[in-house]
Amino acid sequence: MTRITLRPIASPMPLGFFTVAIASVMTGCLQLGILEAPERRAVALCVLPAFALQFLVSILAFGARDVIAATLMGTFAGSWLAYALVMGTGAAGGPKVLGVFNLAFLCFGALMAAVTRPKRALWFVLVVSLPRWAATGLAGLTGEQWLTQTAGALGLVVGLVATYAAFALMLEDMRGEEVLPIGRSGPAHHAVEGDLSVQLRNLERHAGVRRTL
């Protein structure tokens, strides 16, 4: 007889979204000029812990069998590390390099948005992040100040949406039911509202149980 052990954990997603919110607000304030250019290294140091926090969320999400959340949070972690290192060290050509990086991230985000719609919290954060990555990327390549300020304003919007998502998911995990609307649908809705049989469906085909990835 083969036994498969499942261990309940607290949802790591509130931590992930709160981290996105705080880091987005910090970088947005720098882009808007609320924080001056000489303070960019201090901003980079404030953003650097976001890498560790979101990397932790990614690991926990993999353990919770949520490949979409794990992939997104892991990639977000890498993006904060790249930003912090480039801005903190004042590397030559940093804005232009980060511009290309953000446009590449935009392509990744668009692909992920196509598969995350049932998970509305992730989807909404992605949807508001896409124009910010576009504006940040173009600002880095062109040096246009209005694009930088637009990206900064969008960063504050991302912070608001991510804060709502984090708070709603934290309340849900604490009370064991949806308190604030998140808008799950399809498999994501059934995973929360369904019984144990829904959670165990096709378990033998999941990574870590099947023979190969």
Predicted feature locations:
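N-terminal topogenic module of multi-pass integral membrane proteins
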Residues: M1-F55, G186-L213
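Hydrophobic alpha-helical transmembrane segments and adjacent interfacial helices
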Residues: S24-Q31, F55-S58, G78-G90, F108-A113, ...
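Structural signature of hydrophobic alpha-helical transmembrane segments
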Residues: E36-F51, G90-A104, V125-L126, G152-L156
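Early transmembrane hairpin module of multi-pass membrane proteins
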Residues: A37-G74, L81
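Membrane-helix interface "capping/anchor" motifs
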Residues: L60-A70, A113-V125
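Membrane-interface helix caps and helix-loop-helix hairpins in membrane proteins
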Residues: G88-P95, A114-A121, T142-W146
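Alpha-helical membrane segments in multi-pass integral membrane proteins
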Residues: V100-L111, A121-L141, L147-A168
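Short, Lys/Arg-enriched, Gly/Pro-containing loop segments at transmembrane-helix junctions
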Residues: M174-G183
